[in-house]
């Protein structure tokens, strides 16, 4: 009797489910990279609005950088999800998490050091308030996107490990069956037939 554990129908169905989970990935992950692309376009429009209506070059420059960052994150998450590339998703997670930390520190450090904007002029206070608001919004969004790419990467890794485990057990099973067939052929003393003798 074979000592190799047979692959059950439930396991086959599970692997089929994991295979099919790759098919509709754009339905489950499209929301994330579409949001990144939409935010990059929205931030770009807001940047030009700041330049045209408020003539504020500081906020305009920061928003242009933020728009470019969201475009890069969009490309990383899009290609990482479409081609099931854990390396790109890992890069997306690290990039988004690092930039989120920078955004939050740029807001929290001035507060912890007790810098006050009440002594500033109205124009400077307006710029600082917008700067703080943008950093808080960007930090929150980047944290969310980092969590999404991390979850997607874990999902791909689990599918890959399931495939490897399934293939290993399948190879063990087929090798054991081949050994059993060879033993039975020897026990019955089966001989190869010469097909040319029938011509």
Curated annotation (Swiss-Prot):
<keyword id="KW-0472">Membrane</keyword>
<dbReference type="GO" id="GO:0016020">
    <property type="term" value="C:membrane"/>
</dbReference>
<feature type="transmembrane region" description="Helical">
    <location>
        <begin position="35"/>
        <end position="55"/>
    </location>
</feature>
<feature type="transmembrane region" description="Helical">
    <location>
        <begin position="131"/>
        <end position="151"/>
    </location>
</feature>
<keyword id="KW-0812">Transmembrane</keyword>
<feature type="transmembrane region" description="Helical">
    <location>
        <begin position="57"/>
        <end position="77"/>
    </location>
</feature>
<protein>
    <recommendedName>
        <fullName>Uncharacterized protein F46C5.7</fullName>
    </recommendedName>
</protein>
<feature type="transmembrane region" description="Helical">
    <location>
        <begin position="94"/>
        <end position="114"/>
    </location>
</feature>
<keyword id="KW-1133">Transmembrane helix</keyword>
